[in-house]
């Protein structure tokens, strides 16, 4: 492949076997420039070069066509790349001058990019022979270009085959340097037939990559485990990628720790949130056993058990850790007395027993046998007893018998409810009747019930 422009730089990818022919052509062109129309072959060579730069209607179209055909298959370059600097096309930069150029006595040598005087001389000396030679040379050059293109295509095909073999079966981006044809590690510079090789950087140095390289920057140290470092020498990272992908696939399949299978747990009876084995609606149908542990760590009946079995005792532990009847048991047991829900160790009547209350029973508080009021340790009447007795103690903290609305008609005289001081050493009759008027005045007082 060749790159041609007005600056005079020709980048040619050629094999080493073509170096001799190339050097001869370069010498002929340079000698023709120095001698200025000495022979027709060199004249036509220089003339063709300038016409390639300025004649857009003829040669540039052919050159662009050839260049486009060669550019369609750009492949990595050969190890050696040659650059031909023609004397008439090199700029006046002193770094491009060789010792032979500086010591040359030929006054016709010019280092300007465009030698207009030489070009005018060649144009004035055109003749039929030169035109014929020019046509022949153009044909030869076209044939050579076609041959070079064919060789480049063959080389490109070989390179493609080699690259396909290397990357076969790999689904990852490899850190590989793919250089463009105009960039190579070693350049061969030819100035007036003198060759000089320049090595840009070492072959093993990967610090500088070509402009068209496909590579990623190296990652920082101590990176997370799921990020791997780029390896420029081997494919170990590919195995790491595959292993990571396999691990992710295993997690997605519902393995231990995976989000798809973490909730399955046991079958039939699963561990609920209280770490106790019991039935849960998520288990589906309840287990055969009618009784199981509920969520309160106490074995008892649960609505999920369905109807209690005949073998199951009618009484079972409720949720308060006390054995008693529960509405979930259905009909109360035959016993008219059972323990209530107040965690009391005293048997008493409960509305759930149905029917009328027994003649005497304990109330819902921890009291002695018999019936008594709720706030005192004294026996008293309760609405659950039915009709009140003829006389009873009131509900106030008095140790004295007195009238109560529940007694019906009040007695002729009674003590009031105001806790007035009285002589506790006297008998009740002495306190109730006016035998001691002074004491009675201190104790007896009017009451609305009078």
Curated annotation (Swiss-Prot):
Region of interest called Disordered, as start-end residue ranges on this chain: 1-178, 209-450
UniProt signal peptide: none
Compositional bias (Polar residues): 75-90, 113-122, 361-382, 414-434
Biased composition (Low complexity): 24-43, 60-74, 124-163, 233-253, 290-303, 311-324, 336-355, 392-405, 435-450
Protein name: Putative uncharacterized protein DDB_G0284695
């Amino acid at each position: 492949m060749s790159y041609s422009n007005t600056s005079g730089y020709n980048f040619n990818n050629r094999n080493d076997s073509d170096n001799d022919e190339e050097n001869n052509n370069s010498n002929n062109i340079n000698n023709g420039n120095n001698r200025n129309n000495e022979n027709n072959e060199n004249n036509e060579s220089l003339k063709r070069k300038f016409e390639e730069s300025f004649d857009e209607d003829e040669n540039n179209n052919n050159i662009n066509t050839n260049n486009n055909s060669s550019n369609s298959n750009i492949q990595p370059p050969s190890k050696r790349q040659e650059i031909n600097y023609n004397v008439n096309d090199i700029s006046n930069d002193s770094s491009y001058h060789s010792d032979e150029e500086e010591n040359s006595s030929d006054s016709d040598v010019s280092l300007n990019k465009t030698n207009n005087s030489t070009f005018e001389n060649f144009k004035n000396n055109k003749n039929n022979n030169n035109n014929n030679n020019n046509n022949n040379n153009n044909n030869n050059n076209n044939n050579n270009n076609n041959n070079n293109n064919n060789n480049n295509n063959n080389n490109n095909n070989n390179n493609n085959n080699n690259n396909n073999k290397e990357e076969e079966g790999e689904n990852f981006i490899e850190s590989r340097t793919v250089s463009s044809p105009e960039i190579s590690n070693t350049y061969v510079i030819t100035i007036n037939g003198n060759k000089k090789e320049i090595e840009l950087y070492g072959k093993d140095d990967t610090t500088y990559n070509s402009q068209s390289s496909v590579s990623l920057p190296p990652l920082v140290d101590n990176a997370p485990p799921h990020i791997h470092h780029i390896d420029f020498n081997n494919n170990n990272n590919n195995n790491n990628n595959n292993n990571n992908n396999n691990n992710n696939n295993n997690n997605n399949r519902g393995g231990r720790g995976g989000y798809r299978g973490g909730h399955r747990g046991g079958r039939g009876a699963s561990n609920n949130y209280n770490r106790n084995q019991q039935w849960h609606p998520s288990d589906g149908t309840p287990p055969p056993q009618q009784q199981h542990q509920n969520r309160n760590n106490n074995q008892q009946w649960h609505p999920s058990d369905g109807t209690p079995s005949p073998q199951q005792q009618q009484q079972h532990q409720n949720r308060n850790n006390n054995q008693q009847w529960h509405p979930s048991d259905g009909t109360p047991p035959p016993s008219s007395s059972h323990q209530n829900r107040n965690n009391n160790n005293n048997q008493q009547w409960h509305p759930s027993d149905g029917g009328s209350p027994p003649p005497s029973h304990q109330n819902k508080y921890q009291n002695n046998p018999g019936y008594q009021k709720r706030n005192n340790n004294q026996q008293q009447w309760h609405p659950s007893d039915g009709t009140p007795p003829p006389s009873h103690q009131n509900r106030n903290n008095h140790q004295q018998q007195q009238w109560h609305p529940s007694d019906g008609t009040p007695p002729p005289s009674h003590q009031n409810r105001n806790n007035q001081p009285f002589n506790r050493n006297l008998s009740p009759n002495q306190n109730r009747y006016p035998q001691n008027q002074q004491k009675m005045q201190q104790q007896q007082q009017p009451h609305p019930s009078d």
